[in-house]
Amino acid sequence: MNKNTSTVVSPSLLEKDPAFQMITIAKETGLGLKVLGGINRNEGPLVYIQEIIPGGDCYKDGRLKPGDQLVSVNKESMIGVSFEEAKSIITGAKLRLESAWEIAFIRQKSDNIQPENLSCTSLIEASGEYGPQASTLSLFSSPPEILIPKTSSTPKTNNDILSSCEIKTGYNKTVQIPITSENSTVGLSNTDVASAWTENYGLQEKISLNPSVRFKAEKLEMALNYLGIQPTKEQHQALRQQVQADSKGTVSFGDFVQVARNLFCLQLDEVNVGAHEISNILDSQLLPCDSSEADEMERLKCERDDALKEVNTLKEKLLESDKQRKQLTEELQNVKQEAKAVVEETRALRSRIHLAEAAQRQAHGMEMDYEEVIRLLEAKITELKAQLADYSDQNKESVQDLKKRIMVLDCQLRKSEMARKTFEASTEKLLHFVEAIQEVFSDNSTPLSNLSERRAVLASQTSLTPLGRNGRSIPATLALESKELVKSVRALLDMDCLPYGWEEAYTADGIKYFINHVTQTTSWIHPVMSVLNLSRSEENEEDCSRELPNQKS
């Protein structure tokens, strides 16, 4: 991408200039300066004083003169700024609450030079990784004389297109300097140059090209870029189609200007560009400069290239920083959404817990004690888990102990659940048995047939054996059935009675074994049976020890 840039001079170099001055002016009404120049104007890239308005602070002070170069205003640099930025700096300094103007400027060598005589410009092309860079350096014109170009003092570029120029002096004498173009396919004769003269005194210069002169199409398109017009791909194609090129790739200058006017009329109107400006871009004007000025210009060009590289590097870093900031912002939004979802899920879980607790509170009285135990165990588990989380980094042994206790309590919780189910089953059997007894004893006047049928129904409900056929031994049968019921209930209650911390489990093959969560051990034998066997073996040993002394005696 081609950009129009300007050669700027660093403030540190300007301060070494003997013409550099720093003045302070009392702030009363306003600065009263009219400026021109800037990096986006033909008079640039530097900013000069065009006029000092009467009644302003500078007019009252009298030290500034038209034609002086402004370096800074109130410590704000005027180097490398556009015309609009320069005006904005002056306006901003006026609005600040400061008691004085601090102005740095460079007094030009000749005091009678006016800004309107700043018409000698030079086009410098710099090649590098950023493509060709165009910069315009404004110079003051010297007293009327004939400028003869010298090879040693004229800056050379890769794409210079030089033509004949006519210079009018104060003696009304026209001198034509024919210069050949390296890239032009047609030599320019004296008839190819049209001179434009003015009647004003001093040095006046104007260059015009014959419309029949032919140039490379790339050179003319590059001139459009220098004028601030960036054609699109479609406009490039349309321009190549409408302009007829010969076998050498050259086109007529007049045809190109006419097609460009029709194709880029809006852009040309905005920048106020005509054929004269395009010819000025194509023709490198000759500047009277010595070797030191050429070296200074080359050094400034290198500084400008370095500054452009640094600016592009900073832009890339800024883009990368913006990209990272956007990425972090997106990640933060995602984290916030996830946190919000977790909070909502937690609230839903809490609501479900409250509903479960309400349902448990509404259960019958037999389950109240069990629920109380469950709540206490849950609170204890929560407390132990909290303690485990708080002291996990401080004491690993305590963590292991807490884990064991949690596992034991969890085991006891599951055993309590099984006990509750066992109690419910036993209670249900007892209730059915009591209801059957009530039915039998409450209806003594019922016929034997009806009584036997009701007994059969009750027996099927309570899993009892049918009572006697004739009903004569009802009390004895009830007593017998009650004993059997007591045995079955007791068997249910004693069936899975495991000690504290013990729990039964099954292998993948379905073999039952027992886990002791307290000691972290397993056993194939029921812990109660192992204890009984151990006690019996101890008793046998004691008996044997007692029998041995008796035999000896």
Swiss-Prot record:
Residues 19-105 form the PDZ domain. One of its GO terms (molecular function) is syntaxin binding. It is found in: Cytoplasm. Plays a role in the translocation of transport vesicles from the cytoplasm to the plasma membrane. Inhibits the translocation of SLC2A4 from intracellular vesicles to the plasma membrane by STX4A binding and preventing the interaction between STX4A and VAMP2. Stimulation with insulin disrupts the interaction with STX4A, leading to increased levels of SLC2A4 at the plasma membrane. May also play a role in the regulation of insulin release by pancreatic beta cells after stimulation by glucose. Residues 291-417 form a coiled coil. It comes from Homo sapiens (Human). One of its GO terms (cellular component) is extracellular exosome. Transmembrane segments: none annotated. Residues 496-529 form the WW domain. Interacts with STX4A. InterPro entries: PDZ (IPR001478), PDZ_scaffold (IPR051342), PDZ_sf (IPR036034), WW_dom (IPR001202), WW_dom_sf (IPR036020). Phosphorylated on Ser-99 by PKB/AKT2 after insulin treatment. Phosphorylation on Ser-99 abolishes the interaction with STX4A. The modification Phosphoserine is found at S10, S12, S99, S212, S463. Pfam families: PDZ, WW. Keywords: Coiled coil, Cytoplasm, Phosphoprotein, Repeat. Its main location: cytoplasm. One of its GO terms (biological process) is regulation of insulin secretion involved in cellular response to glucose stimulus. It comes from the Eukaryota. This is Syntaxin-binding protein 4.
